[in-house]
């Protein structure tokens, strides 16, 4: 923040206000004082001049009351006038008798005007009104201000004998006023200087604490709460400093609490498995966590430059305002690592107390597995319904035929009953397989594990199939000639091998080969047990699906051979329950190899009981 200049500061403004107040006060006082003094001096001067004129009038009146002749009177009046003009301020004095004859005058040319008639209207007005005349004016010739006073001279019986005319200079009066004005101006200037200094000092007592608070506010903006404002007194500014320090402590506590909550929230968001996206009120992304980046398969830099509608791929059908009003969750399909991922997005509006919307929170869940399970469940129900409907439909048709009289036909009745029996057994197998899978799904199963010599165990199973097989298929055994022990449930692994070998025989052509192998991986302590046929094989796109429930590569042929599509699914559950794994390798048209693993031990002290 830039420093405030002196002429823009409070200190200058306070000082200026003080100075202006003094100037206004001194102007008002000065004008009033000067006017009053001027009036007083002029009034005193007029009174003094009138007093002298009255004295002069008295002497002239006495001369006219004397018995002297007119010539003597005129000489005495001239002498009296000359004595009166010895005063510096009297510039001119004249006496005119009632016949308008100038008896005497103090003008330089007074002798010339003496004895002459005057035509000045002032004397006519005085003689007619018997009133004095007084006027002030500025003489442009001499450039001085003068006072003109004319007064009638009357006897005791109020008879006018003449009039006195006086012109007196007022420069002394105005010189005194000039001196007074100079003194007043000097005093005002000195008062202004003292006021300015005092104003600066007083302003600093206010601005210094305010400047300290300003510095503290700047430190608060930087996050520094350690600095305190100094308290200079107990007045309002001191109380403000105390309040400011209290505010600093409160802000520090609030900042610490907010920072703690922010860190907690950041930790929660960072370690959430769900994706979280936050936007501002315009829909621009301001925050998103790592799971959101991973789920959307986008970099953080790219995401922060996109609006949320574009990031979620909704820009063609939705605006940000539509998402704000969105109440239900949405499903998105994102292609990630060449796989389709299904995401569920829930939106929550960030809203202030007064209702203003500040942004949007989007929480993203990966529901690919859930959707897959829902799809599998739907397919499972459809498959079960289909598998049960087919034999039930067949049984119903044959039973209706028998009920309509076919039971009396000795050739048809046994065949219809055999078909009905076969379909019944098929449904029983299907239900048993479903119950077995249900137990695996609910973990409601128990194994009777025991240590078995796997080579001998597998040889017995192969022997059984070799004796009961109907096809002309040759069995090839690639079995190790050493003792290898596994801890298994014989019934369950027998069922696994039965399912695998049965499938190999079903799809093997006449004259084909079925190869049985056991390979040992000593590092992993695993046995690799495989059954290879030379059947029709499995298309490459379907190899991973053969262990799915109800999956058949050739549905018509599998159903014809009596399969339910659950054998390999059950085998997978059983092998995984024994800590192993199972998979298929196939080349279409050349055959299929089913391999599963089991943990083993090289030796076993306990005696092996033959099955």
UniProtKB/Swiss-Prot annotation:
Domain PAS: 263-324
Cytoplasm found in the keyword field: no
Chain positions found as Phosphohistidine: 386
EC nos: 2.7.13.3
Alphabetized UniProt keyword annotations: ATP-binding, Cell membrane, Kinase, Membrane, Nucleotide-binding, Phosphoprotein, Transferase, Transmembrane, Transmembrane helix, Two-component regulatory system
PANTHER family noted in UniProt: PHOSPHATE REGULON SENSOR PROTEIN PHOR
Function, in words: Member of the two-component regulatory system WalK/WalR involved in the regulation of the ftsAZ operon, the yocH and ykvT, cwlO, lytE, ydjM, yjeA, yoeB genes and the tagAB and tagDEF operons. Phosphorylates WalR.
Protein name: Sensor histidine kinase WalK
Protein species of origin: Bacillus subtilis (strain 168)
Name of the coding gene: walK
């Amino acid at each position: 923040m830039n420093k405030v200049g002196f002429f823009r500061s409070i200190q200058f403004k306070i000082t200026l206000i003080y100075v202006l107040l003094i100037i206004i006060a001194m102007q008002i006082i000065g004008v009033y004082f000067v006017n009053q003094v001027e009036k007083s001096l002029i009034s005193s001067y007029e009174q003094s001049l009138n007093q002298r004129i009255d004295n002069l009038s008295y002497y002239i009146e006495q001369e006219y009351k004397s018995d002297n002749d007119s010539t003597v009177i005129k000489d005495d009046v001239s002498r009296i006038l000359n004595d009166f003009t010895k005063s510096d301020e009297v510039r001119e004095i004249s006496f005119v008798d009632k016949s308008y004859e100038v008896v005497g005058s103090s003008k330089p040319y007074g002798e010339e005007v003496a004895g002459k008639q005057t035509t000045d209207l002032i004397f006519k007005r005085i003689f007619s009104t018997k009133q004095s005349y007084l006027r002030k004016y500025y003489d442009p010739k001499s450039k001085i201000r003068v006072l003109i006073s004319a007064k009638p001279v009357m006897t005791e019986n109020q008879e006018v004998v003449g009039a006195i005319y006086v012109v007196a200079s007022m420069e002394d009066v105005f010189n005194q006023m000039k001196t007074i004005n100079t003194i007043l101006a000097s005093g005002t200037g000195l008062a202004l200087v003292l006021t300015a200094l005092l104003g600066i000092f007083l302003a600093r007592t206010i601005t210094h604490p305010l400047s300290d608070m300003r510095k503290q506010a700047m430190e608060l903006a930087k996050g520094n709460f350690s600095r305190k404002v100094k308290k200079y007194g107990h007045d309002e500014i001191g109380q403000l400093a105390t309040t400011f320090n209290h505010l600093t402590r409160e802000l520090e506590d609030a900042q610490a609490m907010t920072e703690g909550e922010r860190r907690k929230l950041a930790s929660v968001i960072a370690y959430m498995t769900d994706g979280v996206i936050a936007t501002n009120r315009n829909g621009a992304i301001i925050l998103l966590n790592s799971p959101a980046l991973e789920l959307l398969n986008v970099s953080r830099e790219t995401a922060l430059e996109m609006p949320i509608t574009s990031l979620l791929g909704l820009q063609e059908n939705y605006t940000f305002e539509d998402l704000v009003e969105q109440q239900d969750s949405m499903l998105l399909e994102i292609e990630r690592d060449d796989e389709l991922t299904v995401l569920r997005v829930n939106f929550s509006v960030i809203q202030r107390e007064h209702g203003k919307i500040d942004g949007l929170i989007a929480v993203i869940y990966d529901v690919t597995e859930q959707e897959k399970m829902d799809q599998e469940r739907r397919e499972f129900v459809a498959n079960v319904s289909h598998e049960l409907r087919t034999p039930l439909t067949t049984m119903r048709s044959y039973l209706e035929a028998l009920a309509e009289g076919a039971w009396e036909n000795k050739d048809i009745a046994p065949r219809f009953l055999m078909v009905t029996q076969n379909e019944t057994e098929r449904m029983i197998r299907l239900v048993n397989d479903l119950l077995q899978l249900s137990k695996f799904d609910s973990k409601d199963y128990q194994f009777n594990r025991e240590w078995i010599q796997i080579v001998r165990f597998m040889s017995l199973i192969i022997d059984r199939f070799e004796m009961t097989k109907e096809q002309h298929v040759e069995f090839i055994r690639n079995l190790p000639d050493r003792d290898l022990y596994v801890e298994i449930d014989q019934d369950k692994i027998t069922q696994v091998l039965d399912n695998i070998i049965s499938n190999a025989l079903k799809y093997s052509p006449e004259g084909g080969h079925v190869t049985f192998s056991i390979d040992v991986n000593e590092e992993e302590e695993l046995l690799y047990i495989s059954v290879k046929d030379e059947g029709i094989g499995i298309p490459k796109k379907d190899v991973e699906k053969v262990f799915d429930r109800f999956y058949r590569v050739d549905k018509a042929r599998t159903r014809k051979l009596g399969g339910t599509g659950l054998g390999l699914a059950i085998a997978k559950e059983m092998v995984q329950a024994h800590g192993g794994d199972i998979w298929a390798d196939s080349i279409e048209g050349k055959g299929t190899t089913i391999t599963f693993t089991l943990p083993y031990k090289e030796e076993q002290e306990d005696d092996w009981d033959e099955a």
